[in-house]
């Protein structure tokens, strides 16, 4: 590995190797990612299997990895105090958090320390506390990285990138695999600083591929469709908010709404509606930017252990550095997920663009389009599998709570009833419209509410209710609630 650079002043925070060095009027940020492509050769048996999976799949108690454990937890895990091969994105960032220059190169990493997010957050919150004293030799490094994070965050806010308030949860299981509790995920500055470092490295990767005019996969997130925009405008108007969105909105318009609604009791519901107006991000060789992050070009570089598109990006970057062209491996036989995702895109008017040109160039473009479709489809399949398992576990958990009463908030309104998320359990169930009393309720799609024709009683997103758990369908992954009449308010 004599051609590789060596980096020893670094530390490891659960998966990403980082080093922020203060320089005159800014920082030099190094993001080092395990060089999976060195071990997983194009077209090898491991590569074919990884391509077929396209992603790791995460369940509450188990992970189905994209790569064998000897790689993912061994040679490709950036463990402390051992040499590891990596790909480095080496960046110069000015005092305002703006990217000035970058370069990519293979390197050998020797990490000096591994931190958990909790440790880093504790040190940053109290640089003279017990955790900081125990890691005194690394405190300055963390402070520099935190200063850089704040500069990057400022640049992100000026760019107008979206940042919504939503509650993500995680299932904590006991030793028998049953749910012990469901708790909200807590994000602190340690999570955010690693996130910002990864975002800027991903942005550099996309720019590097574009500048080289080499085919590759981009992570594309398009703006809302006209139909969703109109629905969102009507919803905001119904709430009496003075803000709206234009026909060709910028991400900053959505972020302005998010900022203006901070502190409102229905802030999470408003932010949920903003998110629902968005399209899903996909992998495609046709770059059209990332709407949510407000990047003109974006891709995935930072997780080649668990995402095949990242592995492809590493290979493309290496090919560009070597002044070569990267040729895709044989695409696995398209399966059910591929066909399902193709139909979904076609229904939304986002079918993959037909290749233009002739001969090898057109064939290459078609191959990359097929790769993007395959990886996007398998990403959706993995997400759906994870949600299905979580739904089953939640149903199993709620069977032990039949007949019990809980408080909750309406999280979604449909023509057939209300979906309610329970306060303490973070479990969602349905109050069917027939459980709302003896009168007729009309669904108002604009206001996202059900309104009683006789009494005018309204149930909207954000309405607080008291419910009783009435039925659990384990096979159907459904939980039904019964409304405690007279115990709801907006």
What is the meaning of each model-derived region?
Residues 16, 20-437, 462, 468, ...:
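Electropositive polyanion-binding surfaces
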Residues 8, 397, 454-456:
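A structural connector/turn signal
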Residues 484-486:
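C-terminal, low-ordered peptide segments at domain boundaries
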Residues 1-19, 488-489:
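Single conserved hydrophobic/aromatic residue that forms the stacking wall/gate
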Residues 401, 441-467:
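Short nucleic-acid-contacting surface segments enriched for D/E, G, S/T with interspersed K/R
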């Amino acid at each position: 590995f004599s051609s590789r650079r060596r980096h020893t002043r670094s530390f490891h925070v659960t998966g990403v190797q980082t080093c922020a060095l203060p320089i005159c009027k800014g920082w030099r940020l190094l993001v080092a990612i395990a060089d999976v492509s060195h071990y997983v050769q194009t077209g090898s048996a491991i590569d074919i299997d990884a391509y077929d999976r396209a992603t790791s799949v995460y369940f509450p108690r188990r992970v189905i990895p994209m790569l064998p454990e000897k790689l993912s937890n061994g040679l490709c895990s950036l463990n402390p105090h051992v040499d590891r091969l990596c790909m480095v994105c080496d960046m110069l960032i000015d005092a305002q958090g703006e990217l000035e220059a970058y370069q990519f190169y293979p390197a050998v990493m020797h990490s000096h320390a591994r931190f958990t997010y909790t440790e880093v957050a504790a040190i940053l919150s109290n640089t003279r506390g017990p955790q900081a004293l125990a890691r005194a030799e690394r405190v300055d490094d963390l402070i520099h990285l935190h200063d850089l994070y704040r500069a990057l965050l400022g640049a992100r806010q000026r760019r107008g990138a979206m940042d919504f308030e939503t509650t993500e949860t995680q299932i904590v299981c006991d030793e028998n695999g049953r749910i012990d509790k469901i708790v909200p995920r807590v994000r602190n500055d340690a999570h955010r600083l690693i996130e910002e470092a990864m975002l800027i490295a991903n942005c550099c990767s996309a720019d590097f591929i574009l500048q080289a005019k080499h085919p590759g996969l981009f992570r594309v997130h398009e703006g809302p469709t006209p139909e969703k925009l109109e629905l969102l405008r009507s919803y905001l108007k119904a709430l009496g908010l003075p803000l709206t969105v234009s026909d060709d909105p910028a991400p900053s318009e959505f972020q302005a709404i998010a900022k203006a609604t901070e502190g409102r009791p229905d802030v999470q519901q408003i932010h949920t509606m903003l998110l629902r107006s968005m399209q899903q991000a996909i992998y495609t060789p046709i770059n059209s930017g990332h709407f949510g992050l407000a990047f003109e070009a974006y891709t995935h570089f930072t997780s080649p252990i668990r995402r095949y598109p990242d592995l492809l990006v590493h290979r493309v970057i290496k090919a560009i550095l070597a002044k070569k062209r990267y040729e895709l491996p044989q695409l696995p036989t398209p399966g059910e997920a591929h066909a399902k995702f193709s139909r979904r895109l076609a229904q939304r008017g986002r079918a993959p663009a037909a290749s233009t040109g002739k001969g090898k160039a057109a064939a290459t473009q078609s191959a990359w389009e097929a790769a993007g479709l395959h990886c996007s489809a398998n990403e959706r399949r993995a997400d759906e599998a994870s949600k299905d398992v979580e739904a089953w576990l939640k149903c199993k958990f709620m069977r032990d709570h039949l007949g019990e009463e809980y408080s909750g908030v309406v999280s979604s309104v449909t023509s057939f009833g209300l979906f309610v998320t329970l306060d303490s359990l973070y479990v969602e169930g349905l109050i069917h419209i027939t459980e709302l009393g003896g009168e007729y309720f009309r669904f108002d799609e604009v206001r996202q509410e059900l309104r009683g024709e006789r009494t005018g009683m309204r149930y909207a997103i954000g309405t607080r209710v008291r419910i009783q758990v009435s039925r659990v369908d384990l096979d159907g992954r459904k939980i039904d609630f019964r409304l405690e009449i007279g115990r709801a308010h907006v």
